[in-house]
């Protein structure tokens, strides 16, 4: 159990973020649930409490530096420390050929997936380095697309590859301060973003075929395991995916 420890989960209003928040709360973490919409965050906190845990909701836009700074100022004021950051917030662009993609669509994915993770990690480092005792853990939400792309997914795939570089850099930079960083690469968790998969999605050969999904709660348990390790151990990378999905052999 992680009684008394503070976890911050971005994108906590639904899907993997909510699943991770609830599992962490069940394990004794106090979860700061972060997202852009108030009502879904309130539902996440209520579910944390139904599971016997505790949580609080904070609205913030991870792509906005000022919003992220305000978020972490509140964490410092309310809790005095941060033991875990789960950089989960993410988005994707329409699945169109790259020459049909608007620059604004590209930029939005970069702003949320990559810059948002950087902004939160930057603030977390500042808090984790100076708190007493110092140290903490960051877990970044990557994707199986950090290894193998889908067709028409340039913004998403590029940002998830970049998350891998960010994860490794943070892991190295955090060593002197007891800050660990790892990455969970997820494939086809059942969330609003993957709702279309059982009906059929575009494959590398141009065909449309259904794909299996897995319960997001399984990902929540994986995140909680990574978070539960002692300070002298770290899962640098973990891949968890729906059994039978086209990943190995994809393309």
Language-model segments: residues:
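Conserved glycine-rich Rossmann-like NAD(P)H-binding loop of the short-chain dehydrogenase/reductase
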Residues: 29-43
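Active-site helix of classical SDR
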Residues: 121, 159
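Substrate-binding pocket helix/loop in short-chain dehydrogenase/reductase
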Residues: 96-98, 105-107
């Amino acid at each position: 159990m992680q009684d008394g420890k503070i976890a911050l989960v971005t994108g906590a209003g639904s899907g993997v973020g909510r699943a991770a928040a609830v599992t962490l709360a069940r394990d004794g973490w106090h979860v700061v649930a972060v997202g852009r919409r108030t009502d879904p965050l309130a539902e996440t906190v209520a579910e944390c409490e139904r599971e016997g845990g505790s949580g609080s909701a904070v609205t913030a836009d991870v792509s906005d530096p000022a919003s992220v700074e305000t978020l972490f100022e509140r964490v410092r004021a309310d809790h005095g420390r941060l033991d875990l950051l789960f950089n989960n917030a993410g988005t994707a662009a329409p699945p169109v050929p790259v020459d049909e993609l608007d620059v604004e669509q590209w930029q939005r994915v970069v702003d949320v997936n990559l810059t948002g993770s950087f902004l939160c990690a930057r603030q977390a480092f500042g808090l984790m380095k100076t708190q007493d005792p110092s140290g903490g853990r960051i877990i970044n939400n990557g994707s199986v697309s950090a290894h193998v792309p889908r067709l028409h997914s340039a913004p998403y795939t590029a940002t998830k590859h970049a998350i891998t570089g960010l994860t490794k850099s943070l892991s190295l930079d955090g060593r002197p301060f007891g800050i660990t960083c790892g990455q969970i690469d997820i494939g086809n968790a059942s969330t609003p973003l993957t709702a279309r998969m059982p009906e059929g999605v575009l494959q590398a050969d141009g065909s449309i075929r259904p794909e299996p999904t897995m319960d997001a709660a399984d990902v929540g348990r994986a995140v909680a395991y990574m978070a539960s390790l002692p300070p002298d151990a770290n899962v640098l990378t973990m891949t968890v995916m729906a059994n039978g999905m086209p990943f190995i052999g994809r393309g």
